[in-house]
């Protein structure tokens, strides 16, 4: 008898039915407010993608197809970009960025460029890792609006040349930092290393306690690692706010490749 997926049960509980507006284009806020799972297919040259996965920045033309709530049919050309560091070399499928604004007529164009977080390997164990990381994002959404929203996909990766067998797995799309900033009347702030004393103390405390709670040491404001900064549009004296991401190295997820820092 197949073991019960407890993270998936919790996710199912959190994913209540939400009404999606009847529109022919995507609202980038409502897209992440809707919690239903999207059945999607990404078609690309899988042979080339796997062969060049360790080359960050390489781009691959692809196609994204799905049917969204409200009977919105999506069949758009997209551009995949290889990203990431550790997982790019370790995992069978590299971390990717999906450019929905690749074509002006794209239904998904308002979403811009989104990170696609996929399973590291094709196994039930790695599926659980993905569900756990997804759950961390959803929990943090409940704590603060200054957080990345995510949308779960039931994803099929298909080879455009038909030479490689399709891969079916779960994945999730992660909101762009510009959208996070906009929701909070802020703007994204690009900078290098930052002294933790020079960011908003209250928000920094929330981040630090949450990272401690999930057992994650793979982050740092001072080294510009797995954190983004947003700053108020209205108050020029307000210190920047920290927004964390990438939780696969946390003890909560407990991947077989994660090693805590000394």
Spans of features found by a protein language model:
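Bacterial Sec-dependent N-terminal signal peptides
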Residues: 1-23
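Phosphate/dinucleotide-binding and metal-coordinating scaffold of catalytic cores
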Residues: 22-262
């Amino acid at each position: 008898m197949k073991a019960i997926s407890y993270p998936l049960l919790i996710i199912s509980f959190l994913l209540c039915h939400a009404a999606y507006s009847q529109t022919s284009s995507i609202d980038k806020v409502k897209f992440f407010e809707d919690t239903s799972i999207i059945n999607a297919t990404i078609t690309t040259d899988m042979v080339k993608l796997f062969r060049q996965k360790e080359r960050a920045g390489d781009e691959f033309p692809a196609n994204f197809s799905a049917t969204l709530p409200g009977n919105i049919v999506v069949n758009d050309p997209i551009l995949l970009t290889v990203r990431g560091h550790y997982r790019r070399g370790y995992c069978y499928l590299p971390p990717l960025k999906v450019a929905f604004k690749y074509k002006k007529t794209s239904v998904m164009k308002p979403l811009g460029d989104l990170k696609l977080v996929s399973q590291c390997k094709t196994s039930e164990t790695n599926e659980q890792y993905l569900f756990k990381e997804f759950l961390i994002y959803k929990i943090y959404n409940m704590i603060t609006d200054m957080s990345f929203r995510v949308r779960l996909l039931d994803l099929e990766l298909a080879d455009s040349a038909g030479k490689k067998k399709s891969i079916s797995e779960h994945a999730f799309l992660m909101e762009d930092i510009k959208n996070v900033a906009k929701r909070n009347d802020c703007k994204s702030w690009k900078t290098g290393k930052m002294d933790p004393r020079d960011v908003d103390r209250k928000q920094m405390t929330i981040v630090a306690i949450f990272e401690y709670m999930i057992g994650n040491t793979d982050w740092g404001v001072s080294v510009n690692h797995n954190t983004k900064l947003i700053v108020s549009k209205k108050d020029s004296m307000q210190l920047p706010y920290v927004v964390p991401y990438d939780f696969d190295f946390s003890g909560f997820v407990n991947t077989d490749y994660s090693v805590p820092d000394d």
